[in-house]
Amino acid sequence: FHTLGESDCPFCGQCITHCPVGALQEHDDTGKVWDALADPNRITVVQIAPAVRAAWAEYYHLDPKFATAKRMVTALKEIGFDYVFDTNFTADLTIMEEGTEFLQRFTHRDQYKWPMFTSCCPGWVRFVKGQFPEYTTNLSTAKSPQAMFGAVAKSYFAEKLGVDPHNIYVVSIMPCTAK
């Protein structure tokens, strides 16, 4: 018997949505988030994926005119988050990193395997590593937008705020269990 972590499961979440008996569920860290929000020594930062912004209105049966990004930000601030960010910010950073890497690989084609694959989806990266390990070196070395956000929040943002990175608690609201 192996755990999912020991398998080559890409953590895409399809088994959770399709299990006929509901035996599987996503990992729930809601309690940890509430604890961080209640801790006066923690700076809580949340990032929201674009798909979540689009889906929340549908889930709650809200009129699209009412379900604005501004209202979502307000709601997250009301429950206690100190800072709210859009993951699109670091998606742009990922694109710049992958673009730079592509140009490096392109100008030194003989040193790299082709084609270069994106690394922006953790499920995709895990799938390639598990099912097609011979293509692992084709993957970009750039972090996913979600992972890049965590790194930026704990380094650059912490420095800008003048706080210890350990006091920053980052929450990711993502549409996918692989993230």
Language-model segments: residues:
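Short Fe-S-cluster ligation motifs
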Residues: 1-14, 42-50
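Iron-sulfur-associated redox domains of electron-transfer enzymes in respiratory
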Residues: 25-179
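Cys/His-enriched microdomains
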Residues: 7-17, 115, 171
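Iron-sulfur cluster-binding cysteine motifs and their immediate structural context
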Residues: 1, 10-32
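A generic, residue-level signal for flexible/boundary positions that often mark functional hotspots
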Residues: 3, 18, 133-136
